[in-house]
């Protein structure tokens, strides 16, 4: 090893790390592109499989729940997986029982203000507004107000809600958040003139 200089060793180490990183990236990418063929035990792969199971003509709720559990084993703070478990539970029981409400609460603990899960979670909660606990309603109101302040999709989200009570509540909160955004930018007084 006397013939290897310090610079040669550094170059060899960097090349080795680059090869290992590209191999890991290839396995991960292949697993995400073909989740049924190559199956690394990664949370995003399990989440893709769970989504595919629910998108089937006849939703495969047991498979979706099993894949969501596997995703949570890899990434316990995956708000989408917690919310999907609540959705699957609701499909099975036709109501939001205590377990489903607990899953929704866990999705809020994982990601209180989204952002990736916000639209789906808000629509799901406002569709089942009468079944929500006061604590979950408060969290949904805070999330909707925040969403309306910083995003332009609030009215579209409200229109997508079919439950009349939930749509009414969402519309009030969305308007409140929108007005707060206008007030923050000094535009509310101008709009009233």
What is each stretch, according to the model?
Residues 2-74, 141-193:
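N-terminal alpha-helical interaction modules that lie
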Residues 42, 78-81, 114-115:
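Residue-level recognition of tetratricopeptide repeat
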Residues 81-83, 117, 153:
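TPR alpha-solenoid repeat register
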Residues 50-62, 86-97, 127-133:
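Short coil/turn linking the two alpha-helices of tandem helical-hairpin repeats
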Residues 92, 117-134, 156-167:
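TPR/TPR-like alpha-solenoid helical repeat scaffolds
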Residues 81, 97-104:
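Extracytoplasmic beta-rich ectodomain segments of secreted or membrane-anchored proteins
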């Amino acid at each position: 090893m006397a013939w290897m200089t310090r610079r040669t060793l550094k170059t060899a180490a960097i090349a080795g790390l680059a090869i290992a990183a590209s191999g890991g990236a290839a396995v991960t990418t292949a697993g995400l592109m073909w989740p049924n063929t190559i199956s690394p035990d990664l949370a995003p792969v399990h989440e893709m499989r769970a989504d595919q199971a629910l998108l089937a003509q006849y939703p495969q709720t047991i498979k979706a729940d099993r894949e969501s559990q596997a995703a949570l084993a890899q990434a316990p703070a995956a708000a989408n997986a917690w919310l999907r478990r609540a959705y699957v539970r609701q499909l099975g029981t036709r109501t939001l029982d205590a377990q489903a409400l607990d899953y929704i609460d866990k999705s809020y603990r994982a990601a209180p203000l989204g952002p990736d899960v916000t639209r789906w979670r808000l629509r799901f909660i406002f569709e089942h507004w009468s079944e929500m606990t006061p604590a979950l309603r408060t969290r949904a109101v805070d999330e909707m107000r925040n969403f309306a302040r910083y995003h332009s999709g609030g009215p579209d989200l409200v229109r997508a809600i079919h439950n009349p009570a939930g749509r009414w509540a969402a519309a009030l909160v969305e308007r409140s958040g929108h007005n707060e955004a206008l007030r923050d930018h000094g535009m509310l007084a101008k709009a009233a003139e």
